[in-house]
Design a protein with these regions (language model features):
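Internal intein/HINT superfamily modules and their associated LAGLIDADG
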Residues: 1-277
Length: 277
């Protein structure tokens, strides 16, 4: 194997999360060579593996905040289960600091690692075969889930809020036009139909349609009265949320009765500072 080809392969395997032992075996190199190559190509070093991981919160779906984060992972997360390369990882992705900080704070710094990609995406992840298997076997949240997402969990308000914070949006208003439209996007029609049925039972009118430029589907709530109902229903029992989206709703409809919401609107600056260290 030419040196340049081997270096590029080392870089690719390292970025995929393949263990150094496996990289050494496949590329016939030493760990020192791996270190030299990733430094040469300015690849950020991976966080050291966590030895004292506590997975109990992930497995206790009765906890409202766990419901929220399972929903968020369904939207903007990934399960990597690769027996051949021994890579087992549950990840959550965001361009924003806030959800990453809150995720780490809830599940613990001894459990969650954080990786900043050159693209600006931040990944919070847990390396654990046990956790991956729990997600797959118990929650039915599988690798490459986008178009087949159909988790076997309760679709609580906190779960739906977590999904909405990951893959939902509120149309931006302007000085000339106030918009009330809310959207929830997913590649799985079955998943969105379940949410739509729940909204219907709450008297919230919504429309389900397929994007014309891709395979994804979208729930749209565009009437002012229904958008306001959706907001009040979605956040009534919230224990954690993305403050940016909450503030957009508050700007349209004002505050609702939930003693936690004032705290939820505050960005956790101390956690952000710690994450940047």
């Amino acid at each position: 194997m030419e040196n340049i080809e081997r270096e590029l392969k080392i870089v690719e395997l390292y970025k995929q999360g393949i263990t150094q032992k496996q990289i050494c075996k496949e590329c016939k190199c030493s760990t020192n060579t791996i270190s030299d190559v990733i430094d040469k190509y300015n690849i950020p070093r991976r966080a050291k593996r966590k030895k004292n991981k506590d997975l109990s919160k992930f497995k206790d779906y009765s906890l409202p905040e766990t419901q929220y984060w399972i929903g968020y992972i369904c939207a903007d997360g990934n399960i990597q289960y690769d027996k051949n390369n021994r890579v087992y990882k549950v990840s959550l992705f965001s361009k924003e600091e806030e959800p990453i900080n809150k995720f780490v704070k809830y599940f613990g710094e001894d459990t969650v690692s954080v990786h900043r990609r050159p693209t600006g995406i931040i990944e919070a992840y847990i390396n654990s075969k046990e956790l991956c298997e729990y997600f797959i076997q118990v929650y039915n949240i599988v690798p490459n889930k986008s178009n087949i997402l159909n988790p076997s969990v309760g679709f609580t308000t906190n779960f739906i809020l977590g999904y909405f914070d990951g893959d939902g949006c509120i149309r931006n208003s302007s000085e000339k036009q106030i918009r009330y439209e809310c959207n929830i996007t997913c590649g799985s029609k079955i998943f969105l139909e379940k949410i739509m049925n729940i909204l219907d039972k709450q008297g919230i009118y919504s429309i389900l349609y397929q994007h014309t430029d891709c395979l994804a589907y979208k729930i749209r709530i565009d009437r002012k009265a229904d958008s306001e109902k959706f907001y009040k229903w979605l956040y009534k029992d919230a224990v954690v949320c993305l403050s940016r989206k909450l503030n957009n709703f508050v700007a349209l409809y004002g505050n609702i009765e939930n003693s936690k919401l004032g705290e939820l609107q505050e960005f956790e600056g101390e956690s952000a500072a710690k994450l940047k260290e």
